[in-house]
C-alpha cells in the first residue's frame, strides 16, 4: 500500500502560527522532505520533533522527486515542507506533487501560513479576484515582457520579490504599468512587519534600499476605469 504525501504549511515568521495538525503530522510521518534541512532542523527542534529529514531543493528537484515517489510507493509517509509558508507555491514541490498525482499516490494538504493569502487579506480586493504571478523574471528584459503581457488585465497582480531586486522591479512596473496603486507587504508576521499602501511612483520615491530585508509581497491594483 502506498504511503501518503502531506503538503504541510509552516510559519512564515511567527512560530505561533503553526497549526496543531501540522505539528502532529510532522511528528507522525516517516520522513520530512525539506527545502533546506538546516533551516527546518531549527523549526523541528523548537517543537521537539525528531522525524528524519531529507533535502528537497530546486537544483535537484527532479532527482529528489523520483526518490520520494519510490519511497511513497514502498509505503513511506512523507511530509513536504518549504523554508516558510505553503510548499509548491513559488517554492519547490510542484514536481513531486505532479508525480504523486499521476501515480495515484494520496496527497493531503495541511493548510496554514501563506504570505500570499496574508497579503491578499489586507488588500481589500472586491470581489476578491486576483492573479498570482509569483516571482517575476530576474532579468529586466524578460520581466518587462511579462509585465506587458499583464498590462491590460483588469485584475490585481500579486508578485513575490527578493530584496535585492525590489528597486528594479518597481521601476519596470512603473514604466510598463503606469502609476497604479500598490500594496507592499514585507516581513509578514515578523517583528518588523510593515504593510504600505501607496502608488508605484510614490513608493519608489520613498524607497530606502539600505533597509530592505526579507522577501516581499506586492499587490498592484488594476488601472482605474473611468465611467
Go through the PLM ranges and name each one.
Residues 95-153:
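Class I SAM-dependent methyltransferase SAM-binding "motif I" and its flanking Rossmann-like core
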Residues 1-58:
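Glycine-rich, flexible N-terminal cofactor/catalytic loop recognition
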Amino acid at each position: 500500500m502506498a504511503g501518503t504525501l502531506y503538503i504541510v504549511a509552516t510559519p512564515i515568521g511567527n512560530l505561533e502560527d503553526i497549526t496543531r495538525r501540522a505539528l502532529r503530522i510532522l511528528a507522525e510521518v516517516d520522513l520530512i522532505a525539506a527545502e533546506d534541512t538546516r533551516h527546518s532542523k531549527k523549526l523541528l527542534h523548537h517543537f521537539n520533533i525528531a522525524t528524519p529529514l531529507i533535502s528537497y531543493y530546486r537544483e535537484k528537484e527532479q532527482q529528489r522527486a523520483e526518490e520520494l515517489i519510490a519511497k511513497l510507493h514502498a509505503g513511506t509517509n512523507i511530509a513536504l515542507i518549504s523554508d516558510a509558508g505553503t510548499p509548491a507555491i513559488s517554492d519547490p514541490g510542484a514536481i513531486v506533487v505532479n508525480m504523486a498525482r499521476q501515480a495515484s499516490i494520496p496527497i493531503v494538504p495541511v493548510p496554514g501560513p501563506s504570505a500570499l493569502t496574508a497579503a491578499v487579506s489586507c488588500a481589500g480586493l472586491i470581489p476578491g479576484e486576483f492573479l498570482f504571478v509569483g516571482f517575476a523574471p530576474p532579468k529586466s528584459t524578460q520581466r518587462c515582457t511579462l509585465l506587458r503581457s499583464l498590462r491590460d488585465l483588469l485584475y490585481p497582480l500579486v508578485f513575490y520579490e527578493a530584496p535585492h531586486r525590489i528597486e528594479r522591479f518597481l521601476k519596470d512596473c512603473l514604466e510598463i504599468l503606469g502609476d497604479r496603486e500598490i500594496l507592499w507587504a514585507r516581513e509578514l508576521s515578523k517583528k518588523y512587519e510593515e504593510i504600505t499602501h501607496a502608488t508605484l511612483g510614490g513608493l519608489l520615491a520613498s524607497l530606502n534600499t539600505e533597509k530592505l530585508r526579507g522577501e516581499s509581497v506586492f499587490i498592484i491594483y488594476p488601472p482605474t476605469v473611468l465611467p
